[in-house]
C-alpha cells in the first residue's frame, strides 16, 4: 500500500482525553485515541505523539493566587507527563511498544529526549510519546509538537481538533462557513487563524514542515490523511 506519509507527529489536546467529563481521563476516549494510533502502526506508519495537559491543569486556574507564570507552566508540563504515561500503558495494552520522552528529567518515570535515539526506536516500531512540552515555560504544546516534529524528521505534523479542518468562519456559529482544503503558512499568520499558536506556525513555516488540521474523532480520518486523501486542512 502506498502511503504519502511514513512518519508523523500527532498532536492533540489534553481536553480531548476527558471524553464528556470536565476533568481527568476517560478510559473509553483514551482507548479510542489509541485505536487511531494502532491503525497507523498497522499500516507501518511511524508515530510520535504530543499531548497537552489541560484536562488536568490549566494556568488560568491559579491566576491571582500568587503562583508565578513559570511555576504554573511547569505544573502544566507535569500534567502532560501524567497523560503521556496513561497513553503509554494503553498503547502497550493494545500490543504495541511505546516510550515516554520527557523534556523534564523524571528519573525512573520517563526517558530524556535524544532525537537520534528516538528516531531509531521509531524505526523499530516504538510509538514515541513526547511529554513536558519543550521543557521551557512560555511555550505551548503546539510549539512542542512543531519542534519535535522537526527534530524527528517527521513528514507532517497532524493537529487533531474538534472540527474537521480550518473554516472561513466558526462553523458552530455560521452555517455558511466553508472548510478550506489548503492554506499557506502566511495565510494563517496574516488572517490570525486561531487553530495553532503563531510560534508553532512560524517554526513549521521556517522548516517547511507541513501541518494537517483534522477532526481526531472522525472515523478513519487519520488513515485517509496518511494515504494522501483529502481530509481536514493542509497548511504548507
UniProtKB/Swiss-Prot annotation:
Name of the top EC class for this enzyme: transferase
Known pathway: Pyrimidine metabolism; CTP biosynthesis via de novo pathway; UDP from UMP (UMPK route): step 1/1
Binding-site residues for ATP, renumbered to this chain: 11-14, 54, 58, 161, 167, 170
CDD domains according to UniProt: AAK_UMPK-PyrH-Ec
Highest taxon listed in the record's lineage: Bacteria
Biological processes, Gene Ontology terms: 'de novo' CTP biosynthetic process; UDP biosynthetic process
Pfam families noted in UniProt: AA_kinase
Subcellular location: Cytoplasm
Record field: catalytic activity: UMP + ATP = UDP + ADP
Keyword match Ubl conjugation: no
Molecular-function GO term, any one: UMP kinase activity
Predominant place of localization: cytoplasm
Amino acids binding UMP: 53, 73, 134-141
UniProt KW keywords: ATP-binding, Cytoplasm, Kinase, Nucleotide-binding, Pyrimidine biosynthesis, Transferase
Record's GO cellular component terms: cytosol
Enzyme nomenclature, EC number: 2.7.4.22
Activation/inhibition comment: Inhibited by UTP.
Functional summary from the UniProt entry: Catalyzes the reversible phosphorylation of UMP to UDP.
HAMAP family: PyrH_B
Record family assignment: Belongs to the UMP kinase family.
Subunit-structure text: Homohexamer.
Name of this protein: Uridylate kinase
Source organism per UniProt: Hydrogenovibrio crunogenus (strain DSM 25203 / XCL-2) (Thiomicrospira crunogena)
